[in-house]
Structure formats: structure tokens, C-alpha cells
Amino acid sequence: MAIERTLSIIKPDGVEKGIIGKIIGRFEEKGLKPVAIRLTQLSKAEAEGFYAVHKARPFFADLVKFMTSGPVVLMVLEGENAVARNREIMGATDPKKADAGTIRKDFATDIEKNTVHGSDSVENAKIEVSYFFPEVQVHAYEWKKLA
Ligand code: GDP
Ligand code: MG
């Protein structure tokens, strides 16, 4: 199994709901280690650039508006198969279709305000991590977890 890094975002609805800690806790419990974290508010240009692949989609303008509507938490998560593992922990894009026990099933409001972002491939993860975090802001460490 490969150790990977992936980009995770706690979206404005997750920050507003006061569940930053709960979400990070789920990642830690499930073997994904935060190796970079920053709370920030995205500019329109940052959100448009980040979601450029969705530019032609009908929901693009609304998505950019939502993603810039309040603070977000940007994170790099590290672990075995981190990209796919993060997507499993998040659940499906539409919370109505998300499996029980996933973040989106438990916390999301709707298909847009769905609480978390996660990179969808190893290749995109590299691009997305470097979009927000220069390498010097990512700090690897070993876990010595309590039993
Ligand atoms: P993800 O990879 O599971 O986050 O989903 P996508 O990459 O397909 O879409 C990016 C984000 O756009 C989603 O997480 C939602 O916030 C939003 N989104 C996706 N589909 C829709 C839609 O049909 N309507 C609206 N309003 N937003 C959507
Ligand atoms: Mg996506």
C-alpha cells in the first residue's frame, strides 16, 4: 500500500456547524494524519481557480459563491491510500446517496453544502495540495497514539 497525500477542505457549512474538531477526529481515527492545516477565507479568484474543472457546469457560479461565503479549513491528509480512503470517509457528493457513517451522510446539508472536499485522484491530489500548500508548510511526523 502506498503512502499518499490528499487535499481535504472543510467547507463553509462545516465550519459554521462547529464540527471542525469532529471532522478532523474522524480522519485521525481512520488513519489519515493531518500534516498541514490552515483556516482561511478563499477569494473568488482562488475558488474559481481551484474548481476550474467545473467551469462549464451549471452550478459553478453558485459553488464559487458558497465556497467564498465564509472561512474554510484547508488540510493535507497523509496515510495509506489517502486519496481513496478520504473519499470513502467523506461519502458520496449527494448526502442523500452517501453511505451510513460517512461525513456527508452525517453532517451535509445538501449536494452543494456537503461539508467536505477531497481530491479525486492521486494526480489531482498533487495539483490540489500544491495549489494551497508550498512543501515547506507540510510537516510529516510519526504517530504515537494512545492505546
Ligand atoms: P465531489 O468531488 O464529491 O466534491 O463532487 P464534484 O467534484 O462533482 O463537485 C464539486 C462540488 O460541486 C461538490 O462537492 C458540490 O459542493 C458541488 N456540486 C456538485 N454537483 C452539484 C449539483 O448538482 N448542484 C450544486 N448546486 N452543486 C453541486
Ligand atoms: Mg470533485
UniProtKB/Swiss-Prot annotation:
Annotated ATP binding sites: K11, F59, R87, T93, R104, N114
Catalytic activity: a 2'-deoxyribonucleoside 5'-diphosphate + ATP = a 2'-deoxyribonucleoside 5'-triphosphate + ADP; a ribonucleoside 5'-diphosphate + ATP = a ribonucleoside 5'-triphosphate + ADP
Keywords: ATP-binding, Cytoplasm, Kinase, Magnesium, Metal-binding, Nucleotide metabolism, Nucleotide-binding, Phosphoprotein, Transferase
Cellular-component GO terms for this entry: cytoplasm
Main location as per UniProt: cytoplasm
Biological process terms in GO annotation: CTP biosynthetic process; GTP biosynthetic process; UTP biosynthetic process
InterPro entries xrefs: NDK-like_dom (IPR034907), NDK-like_dom_sf (IPR036850), Nucleoside_diP_kinase (IPR001564), Nucleoside_diP_kinase_AS (IPR023005)
Catalytic machinery residues: H117 (pros-phosphohistidine intermediate)
Record GO terms (molecular function): ATP binding; metal ion binding; nucleoside diphosphate kinase activity
Cofactor: Mg(2+)
Enzyme Commission number, as recorded: 2.7.4.6
Protein's UniProt keywords contain Phosphoprotein: yes
Position of the signal peptide: none
Domain of life: Bacteria
Annotated localization: Cytoplasm
Subunit description: Homotetramer.
Cited function: Major role in the synthesis of nucleoside triphosphates other than ATP. The ATP gamma phosphate is transferred to the NDP beta phosphate via a ping-pong mechanism, using a phosphorylated active-site intermediate.
Entry similarity comment: Belongs to the NDK family.
PANTHER family reported for this sequence: NUCLEOSIDE DIPHOSPHATE KINASE (PTHR11349)
Protein name (database record): Nucleoside diphosphate kinase
